[in-house]
From Swiss-Prot:
Pfam families: Glycos_trans_3N (PF02885), Glycos_transf_3 (PF00591), PYNP_C (PF07831). It comes from the Bacteria. The keyword Transferase applies. GO terms for cellular component: cytosol. Belongs to the thymidine/pyrimidine-nucleoside phosphorylase family. It catalyses: thymidine + phosphate = 2-deoxy-alpha-D-ribose 1-phosphate + thymine. Homodimer. Its EC number is 2.4.2.4. This is Thymidine phosphorylase. One of its GO terms (molecular function) is thymidine phosphorylase activity. Keywords: Glycosyltransferase, Transferase. The enzymes which catalyze the reversible phosphorolysis of pyrimidine nucleosides are involved in the degradation of these compounds and in their utilization as carbon and energy sources, or in the rescue of pyrimidine bases for nucleotide synthesis. InterPro entries: Glycosyl_Trfase_fam3, Glycosyl_Trfase_fam3_N_dom, Glycosyl_Trfase_fam3_N_dom_sf, Nuc_phospho_transferase, PYNP-like_C_sf, PYNP_C, Pyrmidine_PPas_bac/euk, Pyrmidine_PPase_CS.
Length: 421
């Protein structure tokens, strides 16, 4: 068996068998084929696709050649929630303490930000939370608080890291079978009872349309069914920034305000999405028989401050400073700020969430290369959201950084604003 034969077979649109797929995955793992040959194989998949059996075999081989992680959840229902990536997506920061307050166990492995989408790990590290824990330390967090959020182990689905790195530089990122196998290989490697996927679509997501997102959801469902695992995929709109904050500490701040139910500085779209996700989890896991009961359970852990107290316990158990979050003066303290104001009255629209994400990256909130350093205090705050009324002189957008904010970035921010009468 050799890679040329596999490339030619897939180029002709023929299905690969178990032996061929296992050979390919092991060849990638053991570095016995060149990057350009792997790329040619990925390009053949991009053009010809994969049938459900091929997709299952590829995902299984990627899972089996890496570490399988299993934690003791002490009889509680174990859940994992994954977002396909969005701008301003701080859902996991608030969701994990809410779920543990509702009696679930959450062993969550998260990633760093790259490109236009932020990473939960970067946000937690920006406020002093330790995210590199041994399995024993992670289990201790589960024992105490029923949750942890840590960085993904290098030993989970190692072949995916190779394939993703090559897809990223060869124009094959948007292959739906490759996206599905990439996401699912990492999720299936951690033995949780339920997997929930928040699948984003729109201008600020890699699935630009709802149709494409639905196709991807079906592929992931097919994989989960083959593995006999419980998966729920729900679509959510990413045509605008989620919530009001984009950055690291600033996004943690919005999530904290939400958990404290201090909602003046929290986006309504974020509030709505949080409720939708939690209700879905309660219903899918049969912890609530009706939507109304799910809403009641959800609202109780927020109004009683159970979720907020769980958040503080989570922070403490992973080496964070709880006083940072309880001090009156707050913890988001950027050195520099620039306000972008409306130049006329009317209805506000932003050009594209990715335009705002680019400004955030330029300010230091994100990275375009893995080696880029992040400024924890850099970011944006939307004082107004899409379709809101603005008057001349209203502050629409604030920019923050630990370094002086250049006129170039201010000008770029002004260009993202469209006001129609």
């Amino acid at each position: 068996m050799n890679i040329i034969n596999l490339i030619n077979k897939k180029q002709r649109g023929k299905a690969l068998n178990l032996a061929e797929i296992n050979w390919f995955v092991n060849a990638v793992l053991n570095k016995t084929i060149a990057d350009y040959q792997i790329t040619a194989f990925l390009m053949a998949i991009w053009f010809k696709g994969m049938n459900p059996n091929e997709l299952f075999l590829l995902t299984k081989a990627m899972v089996d050649t890496g570490e399988i992680i299993k934690f003791n959840h002490h009889g509680k229902i174990s859940v994992d929630k994954h977002s396909t990536g969005g701008i301003g997506d701080k859902v996991s920061l608030a969701l994990v303490p809410i779920l543990t307050s509702l009696g679930f166990s959450v062993a969550k492995l998260s990633g760093r930000g790259l490109g236009y989408t932020g990473g939960t790990i970067d946000k937690l590290e920006a406020v002093g939370v330790k995210t590199e824990l041994t399995d024993q330390q992670a289990q201790a967090c589960l024992d105490k608080n029923d949750c942890f959020i840590i960085g993904q182990s290098k030993d989970i689905a190692p072949v995916d890291k190779v394939l993703y790195g090559l897809r990223d530089i060869t124009g094959t990122v948007d292959s739906l079978p490759l996206i599905a196998s990439s996401i699912m290989s990492k999720k299936l490697a951690v033995m949780n009872e339920y997997i929930f996927i928040d699948l984003k679509y729109g201008k600020g997501a890699f699935c630009k349309t709802k149709k494409i997102a639905n196709e991807l959801a079906k592929l992931m469902q097919s994989i989960a069914k083959s593995f006999k695992r419980k998966l729920s995929v729900k679509l959510s709109d990413m045509n605008q920034v989620l919530g009001k904050a984009v950055g690291n500490v600033i996004e943690v701040n919005e999530a904290v305000n939400f958990l404290k139910q201090d909602l003046d500085q929290v986006g309504q779209d974020f509030i709505d999405l949080m409720q939708t996700i939690v209700i879905n989890i309660l219903l899918e896991t049969k912890q609530a028989k009706t939507k109304q009961k799910a809403i009641e359970l959800y609202q109780d852990v927020l109004t009683s401050k159970k979720a907020w107290n769980r958040f503080l316990s989570f922070i403490e158990s992973q080496g964070g400073n709880v006083e940072l979050f309880t001090q009156k003066e707050g913890f988001f303290k950027p050195k520099y700020k620039a306000s972008i104001k409306a130049e006329k009255s009317g209805i506000l629209h932003f050009t594209d969430p990715i335009d705002l994400a680019k400004i955030g990256i330029n300010l230091g909130a994100g990275r375009m290369k893995k080696t880029d350093q992040i400024d924890p205090m850099a970011g944006l705050f939307l004082m107004k959201k899409d379709n809101e009324s603005v008057a001349v002189g209203d502050t629409v957008l604030n920019l923050y950084s630990s370094s002086p904010i250049s006129n170039e970035y201010i000008s770029a921010a002004q260009k993202t604003i469209i006001i129609n009468k």
